[in-house]
Regions:
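Short glycine/proline-centered loop/turn elements that form peptide/ligand docking sites
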Residues: 44, 48, 71-74, 91-96
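Conserved GNAT acetyl-CoA-binding A-motif
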Residues: 48, 55-66
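Conserved catalytic-core motifs of GNAT/GCN5-like acyltransferases
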Residues: 64-67, 79, 84-99
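Terminal substrate-recognition subdomain of acyl/acetyltransferases
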Residues: 102-110
Length: 110
């Protein structure tokens, strides 16, 4: 797990987990969380790029992620780093107000 701090204040994290089944051991899945007020500063990009570097060094060949379909800012970031969409999960998330959100699966070869 990578932790991000700015002037000693925690602002986010990024991590990945390998897929454990033997024939899928070349794959890993990642997630990132960054406080909204720190987006657009290159911090998320730097965290993801470092995470991809670490995953490749550990022998992983592809990184996968899920992103909420209406999070266009994150989708643009992932695409700019080389991720491609390969699937859609309808009603993947259910919010407290009872509404649903779709998600996209994205993947990048390392």
């Amino acid at each position: 797990m990578l932790l991000a701090f700015l002037n000693g204040t925690y602002i986010g994290n990024c991590s990945f987990t390998g897929v454990s089944t033997s024939r899928y051991q070349h794959r890993a899945t990642m997630g990132i969380a960054l406080y909204q007020k720190y987006t657009g500063m290159g911090i998320g990009r730097a965290m993801i790029e470092k995470l991809l570097e670490i995953a490749k060094e550990k022998g992983y060949e592809q990184m996968e992620l899920e992103v909420v379909a209406d999070n266009q800012r994150a989708i643009r970031l992932y695409e700019s780093i080389g991720f491609q969409m390969y699937g859609k999960l309808p009603d993947n998330m259910k919010y407290l107000d009872g509404t649903y959100a779709d998600a996209y699966w994205m993947m990048r070869k390392l």
